[in-house]
Amino acid sequence: MGQKIHPYGLRLGITSEWRSRWYADKQYADYLAEDIKIRDFLSKGLERAGIADVVIERTRDRVRVDIHTARPGIVIGRRGAEADRIRGKLEKLTGKQVQLNILEVKNVDASAQLVAQSIAEQLSNRVAFRRAMRKAIQGAMRQPQVKGIKVVCSGRLGGAEMGRTERYHEGRVPLHTLRAEIDYGTFEAHTTFGRIGVKVWIYKGDVVGGRRESLINARDDRGSRRGRNDRPRRGGGRRRRAAEQKQEG
């Protein structure tokens, strides 16, 4: 089941949090449709901005939209003109006051959505698909929090007459493990031969007690490097053996 289901939805409440945070009784369908329209508007209108995630939070009379982007300058615009335009469009769409928060994604190679978008952009620019996939994998595996990555491209790869699917992976990507933090992203590349779908899974370690395993291991490594008193002294084994031989003699 872990191979087929969306990794984010499978782990909701375990390792992943809700991207739409609100409560509604009779207006549930209206709010859900609004959220879909907001996400579609941002993904299509700000395709060049490299949007990794959109989090929507609602109160009674206000909507808060957090945009996680790799290029915040494109979203903000000159003197905030683009941000004001986006806010006006969203207020017209929702009919409520919109609070827009633009957050920068500093580690682009560790975000599955941004990696998938990068591969799709390269495919649209006629870069060989194997080269684009391997480059993305190498860039992701250089990041300390990334334990494994899996990339899948599907379509008329290289302009072939028949569509096919190519897969590359490196490291571990345990899709069945619920405590595993799996980041997932998809994007479509528009080429002269048709659309090519790109999917990326990135494994960032297990979440133990609300903390990521990779962060815990990094802290433990730092602590062991600082305090080296627990290391055995050189020559200790020889002295111990000599003392044992004396006692036997």
Curated annotation (Swiss-Prot):
Q: Which gene is this protein's source?
A: rpsC
Question: What Pfam families does UniProt report for this protein, alphabetically?
Answer: KH_2, Ribosomal_S3_C
Q: Where is the composition biased (Basic and acidic residues)?
A: 218-233
Species of the source: Corynebacterium kroppenstedtii (strain DSM 44385 / JCM 11950 / CIP 105744 / CCUG 35717)
UniProt keyword terms in alphabetical order? Ribonucleoprotein, Ribosomal protein, RNA-binding, rRNA-binding
- Biological process annotations from GO: translation
Regarding protein family, the annotation reads:
Belongs to the universal ribosomal protein uS3 family.
Domain KH type-2 per the UniProt entry, residue ranges: 38-106
Protein name from the UniProt record: Small ribosomal subunit protein uS3
